[in-house]
Swiss-Prot record:
Keyword Cell membrane set for record: no
Function, as annotated: Allows the formation of correctly charged Gln-tRNA(Gln) through the transamidation of misacylated Glu-tRNA(Gln) in organisms which lack glutaminyl-tRNA synthetase. The reaction takes place in the presence of glutamine and ATP through an activated gamma-phospho-Glu-tRNA(Gln).
Family: Belongs to the amidase family. GatA subfamily.
Quaternary organization: Heterotrimer of A, B and C subunits.
Protein name, per record: Glutamyl-tRNA(Gln) amidotransferase subunit A
One GO MF term attached to the UniProt entry: ATP binding
Coiled-coil ranges from the UniProt annotation: none
Organism, scientific name: Mycobacterium bovis (strain ATCC BAA-935 / AF2122/97)
Length: 494
């Protein structure tokens, strides 16, 4: 079983195709690992053992009959962040207000996974409605980092990242609003990608901030992440923000990058994202070593200035709460989810107020209040409107940078994983943890976090963030795969 759960997805898929191992064996091994370890890590909110084994058996039947498999990852099981709707298991978004709720339909991303023959092991833990950087805001308890049980796995999608690091699944799906895929990947020594906004359908992705949210792939290698990216990306007419454009050849780029030649690739180091107050020395040392490695691979490295990045955090934490206050208005105790106080003696307004008070956690309430204030008649121009102007300037900074470089790089996070409870009572410190990742969400561009080693400060994982323009996701995979190959294998968490 150990060999199976520690294998990469591409290897497992190849073995399934030649009947060296069955999808059922792989899926059962993952389920056994979840059963043996998840009491410790709490990566999963719901485990769908019967459904996953049925999907695996269907792939095995196709293999036995000599039928062509539906995708390059057919039969390889996956952990799904509990923010994507699934018709056959609960979708809670880490919130009490949706406890036990089952969607009547699958998200487009979920449907594409099923069509690709990928068994879904279950739904992973997350910060409530994807609001947080540590997975401590989940109404169902925190997830622990497999590298150190006293540390957070990142957020909001810490469950998916922890499942990968704990060898509970070879593949995972996350969503990224301000770094929720990339940041947990950095803290757990896994690979996570935020695709270009609009290239992976948001239909059935329960909204946090609609102009920022983007589903994306997570795995333990760059190639596995590319293979999963290829499955989930593509135009969806049911999503009004979906981009009708050809999906870049991310798999081809990953395979080409693995050769380890970056000659002719121009890499920009973002001056605003590598140093200054709040950066851990070990993270900076790891980043500098990664830049040296890229140079050794033949890349042309230069420093790039993105002056408005200094205002990205302030703009983000006005735009995001504003969209949250609008999106979460739908949880009104009338149509679905929790209902409190409906005993026939209270008005609809009273029931709604009681339900939202009981169903939402402190961080969600905080962001609803901030957003409502920012959108109010007297303050809209002073706050929300100004934040949107800064957003435009950040996008222009990136556009200008890409006229002289092909990709940008930075640390994924300013520090390694912090201790559980360390930032719970200090929201600003928690928000600062997204400093390096959120500019890409504001601009709609794509980004990857790839492991860059362990910090000399505390021996915990550090991530290298690679950034590219919209619809140039293949550049991430070429550079990421080349760096991964040169870096060599890392020690595992367990």
């Amino acid at each position: 079983m150990t060999d199976i759960i520690r294998s990469d997805a591409a290897t497992l898929a190849a073995k399934i195709a030649i009947k060296e191992v069955s999808s059922t064996e792989i899926t059962r091994a993952c389920l056994d690992q979840i059963e043996a370890t998840d009491e410790t890590y709490h990566a999963f909110l719901h485990v769908a053992a019967d459904e996953a084994l049925a999907a695996a058996a269907a792939v095995d039947k196709q293999v036995a009959a000599g039928e062509p498999l539906p995708s390059a990852l057919a039969g390889v099981p996956l952990a799904l962040k509990d923010v994507f709707t699934t018709s056959d298991m609960p979708t809670t978004c880490g919130s009490k207000i949706l406890e036990g709720w089952r969607s009547p339909y699958d998200a487009t991303l979920t449907a594409r996974l099923r069509a690709a023959g990928i068994p879904i092991l279950g739904k992973t833990n997350m910060d409530e409605f994807a609001m947080g950087s540590s997975t401590e805001n989940s109404a169902y308890g925190p997830t622990r980092n497999p590298w150190n049980l006293d540390r957070v796995p990142g957020g909001s999608g810490g469950g998916s990242a922890a499942a990968l690091a704990a060898f509970q699944a070879p593949l995972a799906i996350g969503s990224d609003t301000g770094g929720s895929i990339r940041q947990p990947a950095a803290l757990t020594a896994t690979v996570g990608v935020k695709p270009t906004y609009g290239t992976v359908s948001r239909y059935g992705l329960v909204a946090c901030a609609s102009s920022l949210d983007q589903g994306g792939p997570c795995a333990r290698t760059v190639l596995d992440t590319a293979l999963l990216h290829q499955v989930i990306a593509g135009h969806d007419p049911r999503d009004s923000t979906s981009v009708d454009a050809e999906v870049p050849d991310v798999v081809g780029a990953a395979r080409a990058g693995a050769v380890g030649d970056l000659r002719g690739v121009r890499v920009g180091v973002v001056r605003q994202l590598h140093g200054g107050e709040g950066y851990q020395p070990g993270v900076l040392a790891s980043f500098e070593a990664a830049v040296e490695q890229l140079t050794a691979l033949g890349a042309e490295v230069s420093e790039v200035d993105c002056p408005h990045f200094d205002h990205a955090l302030a703009a983000y934490y006005l735009i995001l709460p504003s969209e949250v206050s609008s999106n979460l208005a739908r949880f009104d105790a009338m149509r679905y989810g929790l209902r409190v106080g409906d005993d026939g003696t209270r008005s609809a307004e009273e029931v709604m107020a009681m339900t939202r008070a009981a169903g939402f956690g402190p961080e969600v309430k905080r962001r609803i209040m901030i957003g409502t204030y920012a959108l109010s008649a007297g303050y809209y121009d002073a706050y929300y409107n100004q934040a949107q102007k800064v957003r435009t300037l950040i996008a222009r900074d990136l556009d200008a940078a890409y006229r002289s470089v092909d990709v940008l790089v930075s640390p994924t996070t300013p520090t390694t994983a912090f201790r559980l409870g360390e930032k719970v009572d200090d929201p600003l410190a928690m928000y600062l943890f997204d400093l390096c990742t959120l500019p890409l969400n504001l601009a709609g561009h794509c980004g990857m976090s790839v492991p860059s080693g362990l910090s000399p400060d505390d021996g915990l994982p550090v991530g290298l963030q690679i950034m590219a323009p919209a619809l140039a996701d293949d550049r991430l995979y070429r550079v990421g795969a080349a760096y991964e190959a040169a870096r060599g294998p890392l020690l595992s968490a367990i």
